Design a protein with these regions (language model features):
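Conserved lysine of the Walker
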Residues: 16
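NTP-dependent small-molecule kinase module
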Residues: 101-102, 142, 164-209
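Phosphate-binding/switch loop-helix module in NTP-utilizing enzymes
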Residues: 71-108, 113-114, 206
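ATP-dependent NMP and nucleoside kinases share a basic, alpha-helical "lid"
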Residues: 94-148
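P-loop (Walker A) phosphate-binding loop of NTP-binding proteins
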Residues: 11
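Hydrophobic positions on the alpha1 helix immediately C-terminal to the Walker A/P-loop
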Residues: 19
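Conserved nucleotide-sensing/catalytic segment adjacent to the nucleotide-binding pocket
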Residues: 33, 42, 46-88
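Post-Walker A helix-loop "phosphate-sensing" segment adjacent to the P-loop in P-loop NTPases
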Residues: 25-33
Length: 209
C-alpha cells in the first residue's frame, strides 16, 4: 500500500497530539489514522500498582517498540491491526484494543519515536514540536489531572524525577533526527497549513510511483 508514515515527536505537553489532530482535520475521515506511542508502553501485570507508579515512563526502554514496528509494517502492507490501549490512571495496558484499518497517512505521535533507530527509519517524514518548557509543564499539569485521573502531587513529582531529566537526555537530542521543527504544535496555524500541504504533495508523489 502506498501510504505515508508521519512521525511527530516532542516533549510532554508540547502540543504533539493537538498538531496530529489538526492535521487529521485537513484530510478526509478515511485518509488518516492516528497512533499514540503511549499505547505501546510495556505491560506490567507482574507489578502491583504502587510499583508501577514508580516506573520511569519517559525512558526509551519503557516502550514496546518491537510491537509498534510490527504494527506499522502490517499497516504498510495493507493489513489491519489491533492497537493496545493504555490506561494512564492504572499505569498499565488495559485489556481493550483499538482496531485500526490501513489508510494513506499514518501519524505516530509521542515523546520518543525518533530515538529507536529501527522505528525512526520507518517514518517518511519526521516533525519535532518545540515548545517552551514552562508552557509544557503547565499543559501537562492540566491534562494529567483533568484527563488522566492523576493527583497534582504525583504529576509534579514525576515531572521533577523523570520527565524533565529524560527530556534533556533523550527527547531534546532526538530533534536532530527531525525533517522539520515546529514551534508550539497545533496552536501554530501557519505550520499546520504548511505541513498539510506538504503531506498532500507527498501522498500524490507516492501514488505516482
Amino acid at each position: 500500500m502506498n501510504n505515508l508514515i508521519i512521525g511527530i515527536a516532542g516533549g510532554s505537553g508540547s502540543g504533539k497530539t493537538t498538531l496530529a489532530l489538526r492535521l487529521k482535520e485537513r484530510f478526509g475521515e478515511d485518509e488518516v489514522r492516528l497512533i499514540s506511542h503511549d499505547s505501546y508502553y510495556k505491560r506490567h501485570d507482574e507489578l502491583p500498582f504502587e510499583e508501577r507508579c514508580k516506573l520511569n515512563y519517559n525512558h526509551p526502554d519503557a516502550f514496546d517498540n518491537a510491537l509498534l514496528i510490527y504494527h506499522l509494517q502490517e499497516l504498510k502492507a495493507g493489513r489491519a491491526i489491533d492497537c493496545p490501549v493504555y490506561d494512564y490512571s492504572n499505569h498499565n495496558r488495559s485489556d481493550k484494543v483499538q482496531h485500526i484499518e490501513p489508510a494513506p497517512v499514518l501519524i505516530v505521535e509521542g515523546i520518543l519515536p525518533f530515538v529507536e533507530p529501527e522505528l525512526c527509519a520507518l517514518f517518511d517524514y519526521k516533525i519535532y514540536v518545540d515548545t517552551d518548557a514552562d508552557e509544557r509543564i503547565l499543559r501537562r499539569l492540566v491534562r494529567d489531572v483533568k484527563e488522566r485521573g492523576r493527583s497534582l502531587d504525583s504529576v509534579i513529582e514525576q515531572y521533577l524525577t523523570t520527565v524533565k531529566p529524560m527530556h534533556e537526555a533523550f527527547v531534546e537530542p532526538s530533534k536532530r533526527n527531525a525533517d522539520i521543527i515546529v514551534p508550539n504544535g497545533g496552536e501554530n496555524t501557519a505550520a499546520v497549513e504548511m505541513l498539510a500541504h506538504h503531506i498532500r504533495n507527498l501522498i500524490e508523489k507516492a501514488n505516482r510511483l
